[in-house]
């Protein structure tokens, strides 16, 4: 491969790009219109980057200071051209931007489309929009001249595994910026129709803050089809719902409908405009480890960064922008982190988003339930992290419960339905809702009509340790000792115990405790069990069982707390074991360990010692056969 920077050079695409191009050429998408939106979006980004660079280097603008995007059609030659006068690209920029994909989401994108999922929003989401051009073109030429440079370059590819970069004559290149020429496939020539191009550009990209012109055919005059007025500075009363939707799709990289639109202008000590959206579905990067938000920061309509942490991480699903009138255009990364102006914006924006979610929950419960289904697991991170807004977040929180069926339950509704004598909000945490609902630990609560929240997200076990109460009612795990349960009467139709526990049971409980040794901290008669024989619970003031499991799995638990084995003193199996004489000591010892292992299995664990469990079970079966 030549090292002469003036020579034509052919390079192979990275492996991931080659796979991606193959998918685009043999497109899994029925809606190929997306290509124009993506090219216009890239052109608008290039213009915004130039605006930003020109703050410190105004000479880059020369005598052409106004940004613009031009779309040209050439029906006879089956070509469409999208050109901008933005920042432009150098040779290295072209190789980096058009020959490789640096985003970590690329492989995930390939896997998604490789599975045959027809989901147009993936293109925008994963940052591979340029390559959508190969859905309609069998060759793409890109001619670009970097702002301030005396060189121009041409990038060309047929999308079949390689691309070519060569010098371009200055007279054949834009004075500044980038020109993308699509050589259309035969089945895509209809895109050169002026009406179709104009409607596509207006519907998909009429909101971009850069004017767009259309040249219908070679020699025709350019005419304006979008004036470049930023949508967020226009009065809300003048904006149509479809304009909001189009802008949302562009800024969020989604292709669905927004669940909520938040558009306001703050005035007073500082001025800023906000246009933000709660997506209608989960963005692909919602659970990225860095938990970064995607809100963009503008200063007087000049894009600055999308890395300003304008919202707390538990609101990272919100997409949109903030445009400040007070920050300097040359704001630095350090200033972004330390600016009191931005701190005030963050606070105001966060409170507004949470406030609008609260209004949605109050006025449109069904729509809010969908938002919670998509983003509740992320919002609950705020219960752990944001002490200042914890009460506000608790009011937004929704849960499944033993009384909710397939619906969601708010804490205010839970408190309103609490039983007389009930002092706490009871919950049970675990990995699987069905297993929780079948847990013997819930039997005493069901028998008393006490609602229990069923928490199945990993974050649940953490936030309940940080949120002391709601409306004065503490959160309490049903896997911990529940001293007040016996103070709440059974329901009229609940199964009542026929008799008091036999006196021999106390002796049997003491025997079990002795047999199990330090495997448990105690063995107690249970008030909560009505049908099952045994269950494991945590000590009254010990950690929740699920929290302890999560900490242990993460290697952050030095020593696990010993559980309490609760035994139902009225269960027929327990009564039978308690009635055995001294001659059955060995059998009773086996039974004690089997009861403990039964409780472990019901709690979602394995027997303490699989081999010993098997041997004890075999002896039990043999005894039953012998007596049969």
Curated annotation (Swiss-Prot):
Q: Does the keyword ATP-binding apply?
A: yes
Protein family (similarity comment): Belongs to the heat shock protein 90 family.
- Ranges for the region named C are 550-628
Region (A) residue ranges read 1-333
Pfam families referenced in this protein's UniProt entry, alphabetically: HATPase_c_3 (PF13589), HSP90 (PF00183)
Q: Where is this region: B?
A: 334-549
Tell me a GO cellular component.
cytoplasm
Q: Does the keyword Magnesium feature in the UniProt annotation?
A: no
Recorded hits in CDD domains, A to Z, give: HATPase_Hsp90-like
Q: Where is the protein localized?
A: Cytoplasm
Q: How does it assemble?
A: Homodimer.
UniProt KW keywords: ATP-binding, Chaperone, Cytoplasm, Nucleotide-binding, Stress response
Please name the gene that encodes this protein: htpG
Q: Any idea which GO molecular function terms this record carries?
A: ATP binding; ATP hydrolysis activity; ATP-dependent protein folding chaperone; unfolded protein binding
Q: Which SUPFAM superfamilies match?
A: ATPase domain of HSP90 chaperone/DNA topoisomerase II/histidine kinase, HSP90 C-terminal domain, Ribosomal protein S5 domain 2-like
Role of this protein: Molecular chaperone. Has ATPase activity.
| Protein name (Swiss-Prot/TrEMBL) | Chaperone protein HtpG
InterPro entries attached here? HATPase_C_sf (IPR036890), Heat_shock_protein_90_CS (IPR019805), HSP90_C (IPR037196), Hsp90_fam (IPR001404), Hsp90_N (IPR020575), Ribosomal_Su5_D2-typ_SF (IPR020568)
PROSITE patterns from the UniProt entry: HSP90
């Amino acid at each position: 491969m030549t090292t002469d920077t003036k020579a034509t050079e052919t390079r192979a695409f990275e492996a991931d790009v080659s796979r991606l191009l193959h998918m685009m050429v043999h497109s899994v998408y029925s809606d190929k219109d997306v290509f124009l939106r993506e090219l216009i979006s890239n052109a608008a980004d290039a213009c915004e980057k130039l605006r930003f660079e020109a703050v410190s280097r105004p000479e880059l603008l020369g005598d052409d200071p106004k940004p613009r995007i031009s779309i040209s059609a050439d029906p006879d030659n089956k070509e469409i051209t999208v050109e901008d006068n933005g920042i432009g690209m150098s040779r290295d920029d072209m190789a980096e931007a058009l020959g490789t994909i640096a985003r970590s989401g690329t492989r995930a994108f390939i896997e998604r489309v490789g599975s045959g999922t027809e989901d147009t929003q993936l293109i925008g989401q994963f940052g591979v929009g340029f390559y959508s051009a190969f859905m309609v073109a069998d060759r793409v030429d890109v001619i670009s001249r970097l702002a301030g440079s005396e060189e121009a370059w041409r990038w060309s590819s047929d999308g079949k595994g390689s691309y070519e970069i060569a010098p371009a004559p200055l007279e054949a290149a834009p004075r500044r910026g980038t020109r993308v020429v699509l050589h259309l496939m035969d089945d895509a020539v209809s895109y050169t129709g002026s009406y179709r191009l104009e409607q596509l550009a207006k519907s998909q990209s009429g909101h971009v803050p850069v004017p767009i012109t259309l040249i219908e055919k070679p020699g025709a005059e350019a005419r304006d089809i979008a004036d470049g007025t930023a949508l967020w500075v226009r009065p809300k009363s003048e904006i149509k719902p479809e304009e909001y939707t189009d802008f949302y799709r562009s800024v969020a990289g989604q292709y669905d409908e927004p669940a909520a639109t938040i558009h306001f202008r703050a005035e007073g000590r500082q001025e800023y405009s906000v246009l933000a959206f709660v997506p209608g579905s989960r963005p692909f990067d919602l659970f990225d480890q860095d938990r970064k938000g995607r809100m963009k920061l503008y200063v007087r309509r000049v894009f600055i960064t999308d890395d300003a942490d304008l919202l707390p991480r538990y609101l990272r699903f919100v997409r949109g922008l903030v445009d400040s009138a007070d920050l300097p255009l040359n704001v630095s990364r350090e200033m972004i982190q330390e600016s009191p102006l931005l701190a005030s914006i963050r606070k105001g924006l966060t409170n507004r988003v949470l406030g609008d979610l609260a209004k949605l929950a109050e006025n449109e419960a069904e729509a809010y339930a969908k938002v919670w289904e998509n983003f509740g697991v992320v919002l609950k991170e705020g219960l752990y992290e944001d002490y200042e807004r914890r009460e506000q977040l608790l009011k937004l929180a929704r849960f499944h419960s033993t009384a909710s069926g397939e619906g969601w339950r708010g804490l205010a509704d839970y408190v309103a339905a609490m039983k007389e004598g009930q002092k706490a909000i009871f919950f049970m945490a675990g990995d699987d809702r069905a297993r929780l609902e079948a847990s013997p630990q819930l039997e005493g609560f069901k028998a008393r009509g006490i609602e229990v929240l069923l928490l199945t997200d990993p974050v649940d076990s953490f936030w309940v340790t940080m949120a002391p109460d709601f409306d004065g009612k503490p959160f309490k795990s049903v896997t911990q000792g529940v001293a007040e349960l016996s103070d709440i009467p059974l329901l009229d139709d609940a199964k009542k115990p026929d008799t008091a526990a036999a006196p021999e049971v106390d002796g049997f409980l003491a025997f079990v405790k002795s047999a199990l040794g330090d495997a448990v901290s105690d063995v107690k008669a249970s008030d909560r069990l009505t049908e099952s024989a045994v269950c494991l619970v945590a000590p009254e003031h010990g950690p929740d069982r699920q929290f302890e499991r999560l900490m242990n799995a993460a290697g952050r638990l030095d020593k696990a707390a010993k559980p309490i084995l609760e035994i139902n003193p009225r269960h027929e199996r327990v009564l039978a074991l308690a009635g055995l004489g001294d001659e059955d000591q060995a059998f009773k010892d086996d039974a004690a360990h089997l009861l403990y292992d039964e409780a472990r299995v019901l709690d979602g664990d394995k027997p303490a010692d699989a081999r010993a469990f098997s041997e004890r079970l075999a002896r039990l079966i043999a005894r039953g056969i012998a007596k049969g």
